């Protein structure tokens, strides 16, 4: 999620097909795979399976199909199960690389599930599922190395760092390729003989880990590096042609209904907008968040469906803002990227705007979320149109706001 490519998630399965075109042999599920709900994920997998393209193995070992079957599958659960069968989703797979037999398994983390409110699937405990899968691999496969693809992530607080907990509790894992928390690890995290690696977010880096086998059969690191993906890297013509083909479908299958094209220029910008990092990490007014909140109010009052009810307040949470704007031309693609998450009740990509009536007391509670909670959960920083408040950061949490007023 985060670019126009997601708008053809169901109809083209562009992301997973591109992974296959790039030679990726295996991947796992992330929380954003569920953003288009069960039907969307199922349709994407069916599209990929029926495309005829080479696609990566999809690995996840901790889906609790037994519990769902005992309770009776919901329509969405059944759709995903059927699509998993068609695609060939597995707990693990064996890959031969030269004279090395590699076992690859995938796991879906606890926080990933907490970040997927539309996910209908049930999962078993990630650590216990990985333990069970590793035991099965060791019993049935002649694996030289065991690699876990984990959408669980790491944290500065080691006691809450899911992939570090996994490494400690399943010491037979040789490598954990860690995702979900967007962490850029300059050096692997090492627990025992297990290496945890992560190359950050959004394809900014290509991670490379070179290992050599030790006398005891485990593996030691020879080299680890993160290569920045920058514009000076020579273009691969075949890859670019594949990308262009998918992007053309974005115009025809999605943007055409709104009368736009991807590269259409909407505005020329001479403003230095704040970075996403600042938007999340610095608790203050930010022009990017304020602009988007203002845009929400403008969109409502200029809609053909506007009924004349005044818009007093509009709120843009930082967690829904996915990109900033640079100076120069701002295109349709740039605007979509900046708040690209979600899907409406009509099935069209992009969160719809919703209207609600709040009392003064409730507006104070909204302000308290920003004042008290957003330092603990930075995706909850709130950028507002029409609402202003003062707060004292030294007061007790959830009792910091002293004044709230409408502008």
Which functions belong to the PLM regions below?
Residues 2-8, 15, 19-22, 210-407:
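Solvent-exposed loop/linker segments at secondary-structure transitions
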Residues 1-231, 295:
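Acidic, metal/ion-coordinating pockets
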């Amino acid at each position: 999620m985060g670019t126009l490519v997601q708008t053809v998630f169901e109809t083209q399965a562009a992301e997973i097909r591109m992974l296959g075109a790039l030679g990726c042999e295996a991947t796992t599920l992330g929380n954003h795979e569920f953003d288009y709900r069960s039907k969307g994920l199922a349709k994407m997998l069916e599209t990929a399976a029926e495309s005829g393209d080479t696609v990566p193995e999809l690995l996840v070992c901790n889906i609790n199909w037994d519990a769902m079957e005992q309770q009776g599958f919901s329509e969405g659960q059944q759709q995903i199960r059927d699509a998993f069968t068609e695609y060939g989703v597995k707990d693990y797979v064996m890959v031969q690389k030269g004279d090395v037999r590699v076992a690859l398994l995938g796991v879906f983390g606890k926080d990933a599930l907490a970040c997927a409110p539309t996910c209908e699937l049930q999962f078993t405990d990630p650590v216990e599922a990985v333990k069970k899968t590793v035991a099965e691999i060791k019993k049935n496969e002649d694996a030289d190395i065991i690699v876990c693809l984990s959408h669980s992530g790491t944290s500065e607080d080691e006691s809450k760092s899911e992939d570090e907990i996994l490494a400690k509790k399943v010491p037979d894992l040789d490598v954990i390729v860690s995702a979900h928390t967007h962490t850029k690890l300059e050096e692997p995290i090492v627990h025992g003989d297990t290496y945890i690696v992560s190359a950050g977010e959004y394809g900014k880096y290509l991670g490379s880990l070179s290992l050599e086998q030790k006398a005891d059969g485990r593996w030691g690191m020879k080299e680890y590096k993160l290569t920045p993906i920058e514009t000076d890297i020579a273009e691969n013509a075949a890859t670019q042609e594949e990308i262009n083909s998918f992007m053309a479908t974005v115009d025809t299958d999605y943007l055409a209904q709104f009368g736009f094209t991807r590269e259409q220029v909407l505005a020329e910008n001479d403003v230095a907008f704040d970075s996403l990092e600042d938007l999340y990490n610095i608790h203050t007014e930010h022009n990017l968040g304020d602009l988007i909140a203002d845009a929400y109010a403008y969109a409502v009052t200029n809609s053909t469906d506007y009924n004349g009810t005044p818009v007093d307040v509009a709120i843009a949470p930082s967690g829904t803002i996915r990109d900033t704007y640079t100076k120069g031309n701002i295109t349709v693609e740039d605007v979509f990227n900046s708040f690209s998450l979600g899907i409406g009740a009509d099935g069209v990509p992009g969160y719809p705007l919703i209207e609600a009536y709040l009392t003064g007391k409730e507006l104070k509670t909204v302000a308290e979320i920003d004042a008290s909670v957003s330092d603990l959960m930075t995706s909850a920083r709130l950028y507002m149109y029409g609402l202003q408040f003062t707060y004292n950061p030294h007061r007790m949490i959830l009792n910091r706001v002293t004044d709230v007023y409408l502008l």
